[in-house]
From Swiss-Prot:
One of its GO terms (molecular function) is ATP binding. Belongs to the RapZ-like family. InterPro entries: P-loop_NTPase, RapZ-like, RapZ-like_N, RapZ_C. This is Nucleotide-binding protein BCAH187_A5316. Keywords: ATP-binding, GTP-binding, Nucleotide-binding. Displays ATPase and GTPase activities. Pfam families: PapZ_C, RapZ-like_N. ATP binds at G14, M15, S16, G17, A18, G19, K20, T21. NCBIfam families: PRK05416.1. GTP binds at D65, L66, R67, G68.
Length: 293
């Protein structure tokens, strides 16, 4: 087993209905490998997998749901074993909320409390709170989510567990060809098939928007300049609002017929325009599929 002082492990637990799902999604956005409902008895084996992953699992968030006293024995043993290792220090994040808030959340979702499947949720909440007393005492961080919206809980987790780099809002700008389908992960799609097409100029047909001759041709038209002005205006207006809403990344897709000339040119342009302010990744999905529209 290889030691790695850079390995981070966060164990997420707490009251049912306090926000564990939102918390796991937040860690996933921060690049953590996330596992929900991991039985505590499997924790030692999972730690071995982390150590042997050669850096592929150096940030892990585990959602552990403790529904019975027998689970505690396995968890305490695993945590005590971890305390003897120097290469990994687990952080326990305990999510809590007022009883009244938890009851309201269960009523809103029409779900039964796991410890009171056929009874009143308050009875299940009381039983769970008693079970989790020791776990809460051992937690590094306790978050009361009673007055937090999901977005606010995410912001707290990002603030507590991310580096400045990880907090960066990422913008992915990609070109594509409509003939190959719209990217399924696109948040915003722009169609530039109305622009003059270099495909019909024989010597440009085998080239792409990465070639200066093609990009110069596409960018020389007045309609291209007007479109780029409006597009950059719109995108720069929207990005801060998307970021404020808690999105960790935005995928902007620009398409032409074959994804080789016009869309590539405009994707490169938009990427360069946004890079001074944002973490931007530019890609061209279909540029190598076929040289020609």
């Amino acid at each position: 087993m290889t030691e790695n002082n850079d390995i981070k492990m966060v164990i997420i637990t707490g009251m049912s209905g306090a926000g564990k799902t939102v918390a796991l999604q937040s860690f996933e956005d921060l690049g953590y490998f996330c596992v929900d409902n991991l039985p505590p008895m499997l924790l030692p084996k999972f730690i071995e997998l982390m150590a042997d992953s050669k850096g592929k699992m150096n940030k892990v968030a585990l959602g552990i749901d403790l529904r019975g006293r027998e689970f505690f024995e396995h968890l305490w043993e695993a945590l005590d074993d971890l305390s003897e290792r120097t290469w990994i220090i687990p952080h326990i994040l305990f999510l809590d909320a007022k009883d009244s808030t938890l009851v309201t959340r269960y009523k809103e979702t029409r779900r039964s409390h796991p410890l009171a499947p056929t009874g009143l949720p308050l009875k299940g909440i009381e039983a769970e709170r008693n079970l989790l007393t020791d776990m809460k005492a051992r937690a590094n961080i306790v978050l009361d989510t009673s007055d937090l919206k999901p977005k606010e809980l995410r912001e707290k987790i990002v603030h507590l567990f991310s580096t400045e780099t990880e907090q960066a809002f990422r913008v992915n700008v990609m070109s594509f060809g409509f003939k190959y389908g719209i990217p399924i992960d696109a948040d915003l799609v722009f169609d530039v098939r109305f622009l003059p097409n270099p495909y019909y100029i024989p010597h440009m047909k085998p080239l792409t928007g990465l070639d200066e001759e093609v990009s110069s041709y596409v960018l020389k038209f007045n309609e291209t300049h007007k479109f780029l002005e409006k597009l950059t205006d719109l995108i720069t207006f929207m990005l801060p609002h998307y970021k404020r809403e808690g999105k960790s990344q935005l995928v902007i897709a620009i398409g032409c017929t074959g994804g080789q000339h016009r869309s590539v040119t405009l994707t490169e342009y938009l990427g360069k325009h946004l890079k001074p302010e944002y973490s931007v990744h530019v890609s061209h999905r279909d540029v190598e599929k076929r040289k020609g529209h």
